[in-house]
Amino acid sequence: MSPEKAFTQQQKDAMVAAIKQAEKDTSGEIRVHIENRSKIDVLDRAADVFAHLNLHKTAQRNGVLIYVALLDHKSAILGDAGINAKVPADFWDSIMKNMVAKFKEGKITEGICEAVITAGEQLKVYFPYQTDDVNELPDEISFQ
């Protein structure tokens, strides 16, 4: 089964709504990428996806990727240089722990949505919305 078919339309809509809500008050960009398997180390794969989705090309280097390999039960959260320079060293790990705890309860969508919202809260602190802000990347989930 393709990873996209693992989610109902309502679940996909909830994740997109979380992205839109998280980005509403920040210039930061958040993307969610879901696939069945990572054929290489999960962090290496997440870095490849990060580059493929152009998260490294935001003006303030404040892109965030939430990566999930469903069948491998692996995930990663990567921030670009701009946001990584601002958040505490263990910030992404704490979001990951909360997300994985939800996954273990079978609440994949809820875990992803909460991770997106939490990342957005930090982006808002360090990269608040500017009146001339443009949405640099699409507010959507990518599947592979």
Language-model features, listed with the residues they occupy:
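A structural boundary signal for the start of the first folded domain, especially the loop/turn
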Residues: 1-63, 68-144
